[in-house]
Amino acid sequence: IAKIEPRIASFDVADETVKVHLSDILINEEDYCEAARVLGTINLDTGARNVAPEKKASMYIKIAELYLQADDTVTAETFIKKASPLVHALQDLQQKMRFQVSFGRILDAKRMFLEAARRFYTISTEVGSLIENDDLLQLINKAIVCAILAKAGPQRSRMLGALFKDARTHQSKHFRVLESMYKQRILRRQDIATFDKSLMPHQQALLADGSTVLEKAVTEHNMLACAKLYNNITFKE
């Protein structure tokens, strides 16, 4: 066994090289699911090779991103979970950001909107000065969308407040809806028409009661806004 172990390691390296090249071809053909599947068959846990944790994490993140590109969030989550205990080994800030963004996208897809909003916003504050303005605005937009879609309550109100008070959000196309939500103004259908068109398919899916996530969020918001409005109305004797 000791004699053939070096050969096994060399075969694994060759296998990885071929599969990475094949995945690149599949990515160019926009076959993201198959590209991810091919990379997922690379043996990174063999005892014959000493694969660095940083390399493993990087590969798992790439596979997760490809599955997300193919709208397979379930399999993407499997690889993000594999990467999670290895993220501490990453030295490249860009790699860490890619992990966090992928994690946020999975939370978003699972309709864990408040958690997703927090993650996207945290990333924007941690790496905001190190990335392009367009990428930063994209992160902020994701945080705003998820915060607006989140279930009404004190935690959501705090998230909306943090976003509204952040001057960077004023550049967002969603700022007017954010402002109305934060200031507890009643939202009308025309106020959210443009916002609704910007949502991803999973964010527009129907709930058990036949409403969409946005419709439910707006209804909850308007009920709270109405309650506040009536509490502020007084009558002269």
Language-model regions: role of each:
Residues 1-237:
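Extended alpha-helical scaffold regions
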